[in-house]
Amino acid sequence: MPLLLLLLLLPSPLHPHPICEVSKVASHLEVNCDKRNLTALPPDLPKDTTILHLSENLLYTFSLATLMPYTRLTQLNLDRCELTKLQVDGTLPVLGTLDLSHNQLQSLPLLGQTLPALTVLDVSFNRLTSLPLGALRGLGELQELYLKGNELKTLPPGLLTPTPKLEKLSLANNNLTELPAGLLNGLENLDTLLLQENSLYTIPKGFFGSHLLPFAFLHGNPWLCNCEILYFRRWLQDNAENVYVWKQGVDVKAMTSNVASVQCDNSDKFPVYKYPGKGCPTLGDEGDTDLYDYYPEEDTEGDKVRATRTVVKFPTKAHTTPWGLFYSWSTASLDSQMPSSLHPTQESTKEQTTFPPRWTPNFTLHMESITFSKTPKSTTEPTPSPTTSEPVPEPAPNMTTLEPTPSPTTPEPTSEPAPSPTTPEPTSEPAPSPTTPEPTSEPAPSPTTPEPTPIPTIATSPTILVSATSLITPKSTFLTTTKPVSLLESTKKTIPELDQPPKLRGVLQGHLESSRNDPFLHPDFCCLLPLGFYVLGLFWLLFASVVLILLLSWVGHVKPQALDSGQGAALTTATQTTHLELQRGRQVTVPRAWLLFLRGSLPTFRSSLFLWVRPNGRVGPLVAGRRPSALSQGRGQDLLSTVSIRYSGHSL
């Protein structure tokens, strides 16, 4: 019998003690197998495990395929397991966190197909020396990547392109000497960047882009302060509150910013953000090394005028309307625009180009229009004057000629005053110089549809032919010159009359004439109308003031008289009799001796006597300190008129 009891107390071999600890928090089943000296995955794990800890074991090699039966697994910790190889086969569709830190991995396997839902990947403190270009392909949900404490020297461009949702990136404690310029491109959610304790000496231009980066750790690098560091210096100056020093075990939100921790290695630990940059190009110099924000470099040659060879064709007569400064410019190659013979109906290519207006001293011609359009048909063909190889200069005031340099790349034209327009020098090939027809037209109260023959123009140098309208004479005089002239701010847009049908022009002209004859639209009437309203308002204000003054003066004379006539009658006829009742059943006796001195008729009573009935039953006059009632306004006068009884706290 005792032996039987002993056998019952011994542990049953059918129910062995479990190797791992199992706990359940809410709906998550957590299995802890840490420090069990395991060399493989235990076989008796619950199938609904969501969190599995296998830290500090001796796994060496681990295959993710062994975890496929655990379809609800969301977190796997394999840190400090002496792993040298991780086999990725099978699929864990819901695994979100994988910790592989403090192992012996020399390469990072491709995890995209096996772990499509991975959000946190920690490969810190391994032996990684490089990363393949597609190491993170397929990890589109990744939010945190930790590569701290490896042996990385370079990173492939586009490494982080497959991870647009990345929020935290740790590359600290590596051997990085440089960073790809577009490493952070597309990472709109990135808020923490750890680059401390590397071998970085500079940051490429545009590296940070438009990222705010609330937490940046950049200390512990041998920053080389020279002209190439100016972009990084400017970024540090504008983000000084976002640069921190890493402290192990401290939350980044509890740290204090310290931009001075980023120091020059070649300037006796001088802070990079204070580097003066002496002798380096400044804003406007070549390179624009001090720019940032995507920090994109700006084009500083925007104010230079590029010399282009242009052929200009325009009608000899056009209807000009002041619609502002518009230019319809034809920019084409001289070789393509100069055939052996130009057809009169040749069309020009339209392209918008804007030239800054400039003032030309001693120049009385106003550049009214510059336009290029389709050549309209002509009804009257003006006969152009024949010209020779030398163009006949038109009589004109002094003009400023622009002589652009012959280089086709952004030369800057210089303005030289000349007493008169010069003639372009012909090239070795004989070419007809531009003619100067002077068609005379009516001052155009009613626009017609002239269709002059276009003048074939061939330029022999990079020049621009400009149509200038003179305002000296009422006639429209068009001067054609091969020298570019300065444009005034009062330039107007030219609309060819071909665009307006004759019927439409007649209707518009009729409306214009009727509007001129309308008396209500006359400018003098429009100016007199508000003046009339103003005078009418003044008269109305004056009339109202006089009426108000008369009313006030009448009220002042009438009111005192009414008061004087009514007050005497009220005083002579006012009589009052007061009946009092003692609510508490106590009579008040007035000694008759008080009225013995009266003889004859009774006088007019004008005063009152108040008797105070106290809570103890005593009756007496009003004592000092008590407020008189409204009936005692006339006390202290001749005789007694009425007797009022006052209880304690009441007035009758």
Curated annotation (Swiss-Prot):
The record marks G506, V507 as: Cleavage. LRR repeats lie at residues 48-68, 72-93, 94-115, 117-137, 141-162, 165-186, 189-210. Residues 17-47 form the LRRNT domain. GO terms for molecular function: thrombin-activated receptor activity. GO terms for cellular component: cell surface; external side of plasma membrane; extracellular exosome; extracellular matrix; extracellular space; glycoprotein Ib-IX-V complex; membrane; plasma membrane. The modification Sulfotyrosine is found at Y292, Y294, Y295. The modification Phosphoserine is found at S629, S632. Residues 553-652 are cytoplasmic. Disulfide bonds join C20-C33, C225-C264, C227-C280. The chain crosses the membrane at residues 532-552. Glycans are attached at residues 37, 175, 308, 316, 320-321, 328, 331, 340-341, 345, 353-354, 360, 364, 369, 371, 373, 379-380, 383, 385, 387-389, 400-401, 405, 453, 457, 460-461, 463, 467, 469, 473, 477, 480-482, 486, 490-491, 494. GO terms for biological process: blood coagulation; blood coagulation, intrinsic pathway; cell adhesion; cell morphogenesis; cell surface receptor signaling pathway; fibrinolysis; megakaryocyte development; platelet activation. InterPro entries: Cys-rich_flank_reg_C, Leu-rich_rpt, Leu-rich_rpt_typical-subtyp, LRR_dom_sf, LRRNT. Residues 221-282 form the LRRCT domain. Residues 371-391 have a biased composition (Low complexity). SMART domains: LRR_BAC, LRR_TYP, LRRCT, LRRNT. Glycocalicin is the product of a proteolytic cleavage/shedding, catalyzed by ADAM17, which releases most of the extracellular domain. Binding sites for vWF and thrombin are in this part of the protein. GP-Ib, a surface membrane protein of platelets, participates in the formation of platelet plugs by binding to the A1 domain of vWF, which is already bound to the subendothelium. Platelet activation apparently involves disruption of the macromolecular complex of GP-Ib with the platelet glycoprotein IX (GP-IX) and dissociation of GP-Ib from the actin-binding protein. This is Platelet glycoprotein Ib alpha chain. It comes from Homo sapiens (Human). The gene is GP1BA.
